[in-house]
A protein has these predicted regions:
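HotDog/MaoC-like acyl-thioester-processing domains
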Residues: 1-13, 94-99, 103-148
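Hot-dog-fold acyl-thioester-processing enzymes
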Residues: 2-84, 147
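Short, intrinsically disordered/low-complexity patches at protein termini
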Residues: 41-43, 82-83, 88-90, 114, ...
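Mid-chain, well-packed structural core segment of small domains
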Residues: 74-96, 102
């Protein structure tokens, strides 16, 4: 994990970075279900999952979102603050044993009328699996301080 100050003016449209990978485990499923109370059989019942397309349990979308966002924390910008996420989509299923990583692309920059000392930056997050397929996509909106 590293810290780097990047002001609003310094963000470049199209800039891309790729995180390290992380393999999804049985433990991830169990811990996430316990934290959220989401024990749907699609995630937790191996016999039920055999009847589904793909024949195996599907990772919780919220878990993949959490892990995918967490992977981006390898770079910390102390002058950027999360405003929220838009356009979250669970594009493909993730299974135990899949390895995911997150591609972060700067997709938009705009003025912030409520905060004249800051601007808004949109990071397009794409969580991709070991086959290079996008499994989750979202827009992360940041409020970023301008240079003084």
């Amino acid at each position: 994990m590293s810290e780097q100050i990047i002001h609003f003016e310094d963000y470049k449209l199209g800039h891309e970075r790729l995180t390290t990978g992380r393999t999804i485990t049985e433990t991830d499923f169990v811990v996430h279900a316990g934290h959220t109370g989401d024990f749907f059989p699609h995630h937790m019942d191996a016999e039920f999952a055999k009847t589904l397309p793909g024949g195996q349990r599907i990772a919780h979308g919220t878990m993949i979102f959490s892990i995918g966002v967490g992977l981006t924390a390898s770079l910390i910008n102390p002058v950027a603050f999360s405003y929220g996420y838009d356009r979250l989509r669970f594009v493909r299923p993730v299974h135990i044993g899949d390895t995911i990583r997150t591609r972060v692309t700067i997709s938009a920059k705009e003025e912030d009328p409520k905060r004249p000392k800051s601007g808004r930056v949109v990071e397009r997050l794409e969580v991709i699996n070991q086959r290079g397929e996008v499994v989750l996509a979202a827009d992360h909106i940041l409020v970023v301080e301008r240079k003084a």
